[in-house]
Regions:
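N-terminal secretory signal peptides that target proteins for export/translocation
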Residues: 1-8
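Bacterial N-terminal signal peptides
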Residues: 10-23
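N-terminal Sec/ER secretory leader and immediately downstream segment
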Residues: 29-117
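Short, surface-exposed beta-strand/loop "edge" segments at domain boundaries and coil↔beta transitions
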Residues: 86-87, 103, 133-143, 227-228, ...
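Glycine-centered loop-to-beta-strand initiation motif
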Residues: 102, 109-120, 125, 221-239
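Noncatalytic modules at the cell exterior or secretory-pathway interfaces
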Residues: 114-135, 241-252
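Surface-exposed beta-loop interaction hotspot
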Residues: 123-189
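A eukaryote-biased signal for long
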Residues: 167-282
Length: 282
């Protein structure tokens, strides 16, 4: 049997996914804490969702360094979602930055998003971001979005910055060999620049962005120029590495119509035979 070659896009997606699950369960998740004001008690949760503070700090550094991509976004935020990207159910989770000897509670808003403060103490202690949800139930995503956009609009500069932040966090949590593997496959250390869209040989090197609901269409617009984007379910694919599109270019999506309500049950057909009373068809 002939094996298909492993596509670079698949490898990058796989490695970033693995990186999100590589954060070690350290002492911060197992230590018992004193009952002090402001303490967030989440130690009873077995195998909680965790991410290293140093990886988050790498994302904060990249956000600051690349802020020109999305200058109107005031700060990097993080969003807690269901494992498959769906909205959370039930109560909002509790979160903290914690190490053996301290804990910094984090405040989540109604959309379960939050910001992470810079803390030299957290860096020095190799602290972790910990949620009181099991890691297989939720995930933490970066959130970069210019205020004032319509619900069906996305700005490509925001998506470019979000990609760079995600990659910075992923690299910080990957082993050295994995970073080198992806660098070699993409032939660049700037992974986000690799996603330039369709290739001359018919391939697709596009970055996938998830919307809020199932999509019907997605169109990239920049002045008089436009491009129909591929959609699949709730996601659309965007050539963020194609610099011919300005950072202010917008993606406008149309959502798929809601599924039709279930049709009423159909009554069985009635047939007649000569000299017989009506009977239902078989």
């Amino acid at each position: 049997m002939t094996m298909r070659p492993l596509h670079a896009t698949s490898v990058l997606t796989l490695v970033l996914a693995l990186a999100s699950s590589l954060a070690p369960v350290g002492a911060a998740g197992a230590a018992q804490e004193k009952d002090e004001p402001g303490t967030v008690h989440i130690n009873a949760v077995k195998d909680p969702e965790m991410r290293t503070y140093r990886a988050i700090a790498a994302g904060l550094d990249t956000f600051d360094a690349q802020h020109a991509l999305a200058p109107d976004v005031p700060q990097l935020r993080f969003q807690v979602e269901g494992r498959d990207g769906e909205a959370l159910k039930g109560e909002r989770p509790l979160a903290r930055i914690a190490a053996d000897d301290f804990s910094i509670p984090l405040s989540l808003d109604e959309q379960a998003s939050f910001s992470v403060p810079r803390s030299q103490a957290a860096w020095d202690a190799k602290a972790e971001l910990i949620l009181n949800r099991k890691k297989y139930d939720v995930r933490v995503e970066t959130w970069v979005r210019t205020p004032g956009l319509a619900d069906n609009q996305y700005r490509i500069g925001d998506i470019r910055l979000d990609c760079r932040v995600k990659v910075a966090i992923g690299k910080a949590e990957m082993p050295f060999w994995a970073v080198g593997l992806v660098n070699g496959l993409l032939l660049t250390t700037d992974w986000c620049s690799w996603f330039k869209g369709e290739t001359p040989k018919g391939g697709d090197r596009s970055w996938s962005r998830r919307a809020n609901a199932k999509l019907s269409t997605a169109t990239l617009r920049d002045g008089e120029r436009s491009l129909a984007l591929r959609v699949s379910g709730k996601s659309f694919r965007i050539p963020i590495g194609d610099t011919s599109w300005s950072n202010d270019a917008l993606i406008e999506v149309t959502y798929a119509p809601a599924e039709d309500a279930a049709a009423p049950a159909t009554l069985p057909a009635v047939t007649r035979t000569a000299g017989e009373t009506p009977r239902t068809a078989p």
